């Protein structure tokens, strides 16, 4: 299998399971309605773990442009493959979001809150302060990259590494996710946000493009900083 196809499939699965758990919690008349933040963060952690198990042996399961760019920045990934990886990740996230939309098709009309519908697809700040929101995404992604590199260096637990990465993302969500919803992944936010803009979702609001740069720029900066700091320290 092509590494680019693997990144597409891995990111698609990430969004099916990740955006899917958000849909289950926030859309009305779903079985998981109002089950809360811990369910969402747990679902996202498991989504990451399952995606890494699926394609990790093929492409490394970056499933995140911030990871791809961070690794390239410290010389652990060729820059020539960066554009293809990022395109595959964004496309996978876009398709994954469409599949979530189709899965919950009857529930969009049942849900009155347009913000809840948007939240299924992409992140938004609890308090809109762009500087603080950007800093939150930088810190969260910095922790992600340092953790991923640290887990990857543990050669005694290769079979457990995807699960440990899932626990890492779960922990980031529980601890650092409150201010922005912890995108920590430009593809995870941009691809589904684009799907939200295009899909015929009844009663939807705008796709909040004025905020969309934060979960793109913040994770990229954080990924570079986290990878560089880990590389310097260890």
UniProtKB/Swiss-Prot annotation:
Cite the InterPro entries for this sequence. Aquaporin-like, MIP, MIP/Aquaporin, MIP_CS
Q: Can you say where in the cell this protein is located?
A: Cell membrane
Sequence motif NPA 2, residues: 185-187
UniProt xrefs under Gene3D superfamilies:
Glycerol uptake facilitator protein
Where do transmembrane segments lie in this chain? 3-23, 36-56, 82-102, 134-154, 164-184, 214-234
The main location class comes to membrane
Enumerate the UniProt keywords alphabetically. Cell membrane, Membrane, Repeat, Transmembrane, Transmembrane helix, Transport
Topology versus the membrane: Multi-pass membrane protein
Q: Has the keyword Magnesium been applied to this entry?
A: no
Q: Which GO terms describe its cellular component?
A: plasma membrane
Catalysis: reaction(s): glycerol(in) = glycerol(out)
Output one GO MF annotation. glycerol channel activity
Pfam family for this entry, one: MIP
Instruction: Report the protein's function.
Output: Mediates glycerol diffusion across the cytoplasmic membrane via a pore-type mechanism.
The family annotation for this protein states: Belongs to the MIP/aquaporin (TC 1.A.8) family.
Tell me the domain comment: Aquaporins contain two tandem repeats each containing three membrane-spanning domains and a pore-forming loop with the signature motif Asn-Pro-Ala (NPA).
According to UniProt, the name of this protein is Probable glycerol uptake facilitator protein
């Amino acid at each position: 299998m092509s590494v680019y196809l693997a990144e597409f499939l891995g990111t698609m699965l990430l969004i099916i399971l990740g955006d899917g758990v958000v849909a289950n919690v926030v859309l009305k008349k779903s079985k998981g309605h109002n089950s809360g933040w811990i369910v969402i963060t747990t679902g996202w952690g498991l989504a990451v773990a399952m995606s890494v198990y699926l394609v990790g042996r093929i492409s490394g399961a970056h499933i995140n442009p911030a990871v791809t760019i961070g690794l390239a920045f410290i010389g652990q990934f060729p820059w020539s493959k960066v554009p293809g990886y990022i395109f595959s990740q964004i496309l996978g996230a876009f398709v994954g979001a469409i599949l979530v939309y189709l899965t919950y098709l009857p529930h969009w009309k049942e849900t009155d809150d347009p913000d809840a519908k948007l939240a299924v697809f992409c992140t938004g700040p609890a308090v809109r302060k762009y500087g603080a929101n950007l800093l939150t995404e930088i810190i969260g992604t910095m922790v992600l990259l340092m953790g991923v590199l640290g887990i990857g260096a543990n050669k005694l637990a290769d079979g457990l590494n995807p699960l440990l990465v899932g626990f890492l993302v779960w922990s980031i969500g529980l601890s650092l996710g409150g201010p922005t919803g912890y995108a920590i992944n430009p593809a995870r936010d941009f691809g589904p946000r684009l799907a939200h803009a295009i899909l015929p979702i009844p009663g939807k609001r705008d796709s909040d493009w004025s905020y969309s740069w934060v979960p793109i720029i913040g994770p990229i900066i954080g990924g570079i900083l986290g990878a560089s700091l880990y590389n310097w320290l260890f």
